[in-house]
Structure formats: structure tokens, C-alpha cells
């Protein structure tokens, strides 16, 4: 994030240094026009040259290679300077990321006297509707070591967790309560993943995040220090936010799931397994199917123990790179068997800075160095999405078409396993 760089740039400008000479600040990118830049920096082990702009335009393999280098240089401890030759003796140079804020600094940033309102220029149009969803929410953490392929948070906030103090959250909550539009409860307390409140392990603090593996994928790292004790303490003051179920399962105490089910779910828990097919989950960098099924069993058992009828609403993504129509069918069968009715299904669309988008464009998974099937045909994307909402009458024709293409007419009928009725 930009707090440290902005302050350092301001100090440099105040000292009379020209903008073109401010090239040392972490978390910034600058233009280098020295034609001998490569030669003069050939000795620098902390500089890594990316494939040139011309190279990544002509070669998807080099594009994927460039993405992977950038993806592995997002931590302030281990990241190198990166340089890409743009042409005409111009290099784009990216300095290593800024150091994460300390807890005191994070508290200070979020306790500044913000207006908590949209700009007055929007008032004639009725304001900004999206603001209502977040106005009475608290940001508790920054950073995420979840590593989902379709998320750009690794680039924006890094994999190291920074969290605010409970006292700071309470002070901000008191300000929210005083707002004339406050309706009685705080909607959300969290961040990218609410139950990440601390770095994933002690090693991360000393040596930075690992560049050779991720914290939760393909399985939870044995060095993970899953601890929900501080988060549980905060929950006793606030309403539950979104959680990461594989990290919850790594907490051997089991206390967090008990606390969650007993006090912090208002009937339904929203979770995001994203898919069920291991073929797709591999590309998403999400835990495999068995992990979600284990969580479902534990969640059901805990609610039975405390005598509550509480349900689960899963979120899914259709047409993600790697997803075939067969995978969509597998997910539909799972949903039918387990009685899930998806509340939200998002058709994958590419967004800047994500591993999934790199796969979408190149057809290559750079982390696995493998070719990937990309469902880009509009008709197939319609079929995949319809399969996930097979229960909707308006999707019946599309579901039947998909099942016939797959040779799964056994799922068309009136039986308990059928996804759709005949015409």
C-alpha cells in the first residue's frame, strides 16, 4: 500500500529533489533512460530483468514467465528490483514493495478523520449505492496469504498480515454508532480474509514469505501457526465476517468453529469453496474437494451439538481457466446431492494482476508450467453458468443441452438424482 511511499516522496520533493531523480523509494516505479542501464547493473544480484515489452507482446510463454517473476517478488523482504525494457532506450523499473505498516501505524491510518461519505458531486445522482454496503464496516486487517489465483491482493497488499488493535477497532466503532444513518449493527469486521489476524508463521517475519510454495496451497503448510484466539476476542465485541475454512480447520483447538456456530451466525454461513472439481481447484489454488467436505461435516456436527439449525451458502465461479463442461456437471451433481442452492455464481472474467487472468490470456499456468484449457466460447460459458443454477426454470433448456452434449442424459428425468426434467 502507499502510505510510506507517499510520505517519502513528499519529503524528497520538499527537500528540492526533482521528480526524475526520486528513484530509490520502495513501492514506486520509475522510468530509466540510461542506454547502458543493463550493462551498468549487470553486477547487481538484487535486480532481475523481465522479458522485454516486445517479447511479451509476441510470446505468450514469455508473458507467463514475466508474470511468474513478478508474482514471486511481492514481499518487502525477499523481492528484487524488476526492470522491463520498453524500447527506445527506456526501461520501466519497479522497486521492491514498501515495508508493511506496524500495528500502531495501521491504527493511526484508519483513525484519521475521514468523511465516510461520497464526494458531493455524486449527490445529485442519489449518491453512490455501493457505499451503503461498506459504510458501517470496519477494516481489521491488511494482507492475505490465501493465494487464490483469481485475486490480485498479493500485488496490492502482500501476503504478510497486518492487523489493527482491538482498542482501535472499538474507537472507530464508537464513531460509526454516532452517525445519524446508523441502524443498529456493524455489518462487517475484517478485510481480505477476516480470520487472518497474524502472519502465517514466525519464519515469515524473519525471512519474508516463501517464494517456492504458498501457505495454504496445495495443502496447508506444516509451519502454519493457525491461531484464532485474538479474532475470537474481537468477535465478542463485533459481528462475524467472512472466513477461510481451510485455515479454520488447521486450528487444532476447534474453539473458533464452536464460537462461530454458537454466537456469530444468523442462520446461514457464507463460504467460498469456488468449485468442487479438483481439476479446477488446482488452477484456482484452492484446497481440494475433500477439505471443503470435511468442513461441511464439522459444521453440521457442531450445529447438531448445540441444537441449532444453521445452514451454509456456498459461492462458486463458473468458466474459470481449467474448467470444462464436465467439471460444471460434477459441481451440479454435488450441489444436488448435498441440497445446496447457490446464492451467488460468478462467471469468471479477467481482471488485472491475477494468476487466473494470466492463464486466461496465455492458456498457460505459469506456476505449474502447464497448458490449461480456457473456456472462452460464449455458448460454453452460458452452459457452465446455467449448470450451476440448474434449479432455475429459465435454465432448463441450457441444462438439458449441456447434459446431452456430455452424454449424461441419466441426469434428465424425475428421479432424486436428476438435475432437470424432460421437456
Q: Which residues does each predicted region cover?
A:
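N-terminal pre-triad scaffold of radical SAM enzymes
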Residues: 123-152, 182-185
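Glycine-rich beta-alpha loop elements in corrinoid/cobalamin-binding modules
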Residues: 1-86, 388
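Flexible glycine/acidic-rich beta-alpha junction loops that bind and position SAM and/or redox cofactors
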Residues: 3-14, 29-37, 160, 184-210, ...
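Ferredoxin-type iron-sulfur electron-transfer modules and their immediate structural context
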Residues: 49-134
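Conserved, mostly hydrophobic/aromatic
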Residues: 109, 144, 148, 169, ...
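Flexible, glycine-rich loop/tail regions that form catalytic "lids" or insertion modules at the edges
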Residues: 22-27, 123, 131, 139, ...
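Conserved SAM/AdoMet-binding glycine-rich loop
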Residues: 174-313, 317-321
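Conserved alpha-helical substructure of the radical SAM core
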Residues: 157-185
